[in-house]
C-alpha cells in the first residue's frame, strides 16, 4: 500500500500528511506454522516486524512477534507473545505486547510514547440451551499517564423465534472507576433484513 499518513485521526476529515508505504506478507511454511513479515516506511520513521503463528495439535495456537523501529527518537523494539485454545464450546487465551520507550508505529502521534505493555486474558463459553458467555481482562501500562485496567463480560442468547438479546458490562478499575452497561435486542424483520 502506498498513500499518505492521516493527521488528527478522529477529529479532522480529509487531513493527510507524510507519504508512506506499508506492506505485509504472510506465508504458510508448514501445515502448523505461518510466518509474517510487515513493514512501514515514512520519510523519518521506519518499522519492520516478524511474526509467527504455530498450531500445537491438541494444545492450542501459539503466536509471537518481534518488531524494531527507527525514528527521531532512536531505535525502538517491541515483542509480543500469545496463546489461545478453542473448541466448540470453550475458549480461552492470553496475549501481551511489551515495547521499548523509543518504539514507534503508524497511528502514533510524534510526541506519543509507546505503552510499556498491553496485556489481555479472555475466556468464553458457548452452550446449546443457555447462550454464550465471555469475560475479558485488559491492562495497558503507560509511561506518561495512568494505567488502564478494564474488566468486561458479555452474555448473548436466542429468544426462540422472536430474536436475540445481548448484554455486556465493562468496568474501568483505574482512575475514576466507571461502569458501562449495554443491552441490545435484534429481530428478523424478513428473509433478508434484521
Language model region names:
Residues 1-5, 40, 55, 59-194:
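Flexible, glycine-rich linker and terminal segments associated
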Amino acid at each position: 500500500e502506498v498513500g499518505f499518513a492521516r493527521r488528527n485521526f478522529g477529529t479532522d476529515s480529509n487531513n493527510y500528511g507524510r507519504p508512506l508505504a506499508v506492506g505485509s506478507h504472510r506465508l504458510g511454511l508448514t501445515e502448523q506454522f505461518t510466518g509474517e513479515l510487515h513493514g512501514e516506511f515514512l520519510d523519518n520513521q521506519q518499522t519492520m516486524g516478524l511474526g509467527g503463528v504455530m498450531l500445537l495439535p491438541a494444545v492450542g495456537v501459539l503466536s509471537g512477534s518481534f518488531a524494531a523501529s527507527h525514528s527521531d527518537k532512536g531505535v525502538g523494539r517491541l515483542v509480543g507473545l500469545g496463546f489461545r485454545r478453542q473448541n466448540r464450546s470453550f475458549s480461552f487465551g492470553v496475549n501481551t505486547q511489551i515495547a521499548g520507550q523509543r518504539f514507534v508505529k503508524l497511528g502514533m502521534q510524534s510526541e506519543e510514547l509507546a505503552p510499556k505493555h498491553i496485556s489481555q486474558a479472555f475466556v468464553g463459553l458457548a452452550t446449546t440451551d443457555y447462550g454464550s458467555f465471555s469475560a475479558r481482562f485488559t491492562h495497558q501500562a503507560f509511561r506518561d499517564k495512568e494505567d488502564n485496567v478494564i474488566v468486561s463480560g458479555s452474555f448473548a442468547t436466542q429468544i426462540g423465534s422472536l430474536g436475540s438479546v445481548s448484554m455486556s458490562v465493562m468496568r474501568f478499575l483505574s482512575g475514576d472507576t466507571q461502569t458501562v452497561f449495554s443491552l441490545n435486542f435484534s429481530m428478523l424483520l424478513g428473509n433478508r433484513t434484521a
